[in-house]
A protein has these predicted regions:
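Non-globular targeting/processing and membrane-anchoring segments
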Residues: 1-78, 100-104
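Thiol-based oxidoreductase modules, predominantly thioredoxin-like and allied folds used
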Residues: 80-84, 98, 106-112
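Conserved redox-active cysteine motifs that mediate thiol-disulfide chemistry
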Residues: 86-93
Length: 112
């Protein structure tokens, strides 16, 4: 099955920005839930762990001045459309850096 332009446009319209996703993660932790239809203790625990990891990485990661300069000179607009769930460990490790990279260029954004 291939993804159509209409599906991508729909996903972009309903997507969250990164700060909103972090707020959602916090709300899910508070409610003892995870994203998605399936709810389990394991997924709830992964959500809790990922929220902690992402908060830590948001505080400790940085983009070097050299990389920032290269990003700021990149002429094209970019939107990172990320498909994820709150319990996904890979996203917890990568989204904080993707967000920091996108923040270096006003014409770049992250949607989840």
């Amino acid at each position: 099955m291939s993804t159509t332009k209409a599906q991508i446009e729909s996903a972009i319209k309903t997507a969250l920005d990164y700060p909103s996703y972090m707020t959602l993660m916090q709300e899910l932790v508070h409610k003892g839930m995870s994203t998605g239809l399936e709810q389990s203790d394991a997924l709830t625990n992964y959500t809790l762990l990922n929220n902690k990891r992402m908060k830590r990485l948001n505080k400790t990661l940085s983009v070097s001045a050299q990389v920032q300069a290269r990003i700021q000179n990149y002429p094209k607009d970019i939107r990172f459309l990320v498909l994820t769930e709150s319990w996904c460990g890979d996203a917890a490790q990568s989204l904080p850096m993707v967000s920091k990279i996108a923040a270096c260029q006003p014409n770049w954004s992250v949607s989840l």
